[in-house]
Amino acid sequence: MTSITIALSKGRIFDDTAPLLKAAGIIPLDDPETSRKLILATNRDDVRLIIVRASDVPTYVQYGAADMGIAGKDVLLEHGGAGLYQPLDLNIARCRMMVAVRSDFDYESAVRRGARVRVATKYLQTAREHFAEKGMHVDLIKLYGSMELAPLVGLADAIVDLVSSGNTLKANNLKAVEEIMPISSRLIINQAALKLKRRAIQPMLEAFSAAITPLTPLSPYPLGATP
């Protein structure tokens, strides 16, 4: 019997993935939010789940420790996608990658003047490409969390981060000034596993595809002001 290992992360992505797993006949026997187990058995003897950090999902799949996984587009862009097949946009965990600044910072003026802007983010590669395309001079500062704090204490002029409702920006007196791209989660498959385990993987791929909620456009985000 061919076994399949699926890499997932806790939180919103796992919650949004549960209906897709169920559509493929896969039900975890433990709740990752309450269980300390990092390897979860399922109702199927041939499928197990491993729980890893969201940023590590592509690495586990790339090197074959997992056959499949679900990762956000933001994570995949930073990873680079080597060794991965990305057959499906699952339309889950949707948000935006945006540039945000303090509400009293004149970002547009800084861009026009060609001022050098300090930007805090954990998405260095994506941010570097975005600002290079705009011809902006930026100093990128790597952070791993609490991005909203950076402009408030003078560490950075701007941040690049994921935004859903915008409530966190509003609570910290920040405003979004640019949308870099929409973000959602993708199904990723190890390229070698797709060849060697296609008969086991293909039915899951088809079940996921059939269960995807049709995409509805994200409503416009109010740039230049806290929502």
Curated annotation (Swiss-Prot):
Domain of life: Bacteria
Locations listed in the record: Cytoplasm
InterPro entries reported for this sequence: ATP_PRibTrfase_cat, ATP_PRibTrfase_CS, ATP_PRibTrfase_HisG, ATP_PRibTrfase_HisG_short
Entry GO terms, CC: cytoplasm
Reactions that this protein is recorded to catalyse: 1-(5-phospho-beta-D-ribosyl)-ATP + diphosphate = 5-phospho-alpha-D-ribose 1-diphosphate + ATP
Keywords: Amino-acid biosynthesis, ATP-binding, Cytoplasm, Glycosyltransferase, Histidine biosynthesis, Nucleotide-binding, Transferase
Family classification: Belongs to the ATP phosphoribosyltransferase family. Short subfamily.
Domain notes: Lacks the C-terminal regulatory region which is replaced by HisZ.
HAMAP family in the cross-refs: HisG_Short
Protein name, as recorded: ATP phosphoribosyltransferase
Species of provenance: Nitrosospira multiformis (strain ATCC 25196 / NCIMB 11849 / C 71)
Source organism phylogeny: Bacteria, Pseudomonadati, Pseudomonadota, Betaproteobacteria, Nitrosomonadales
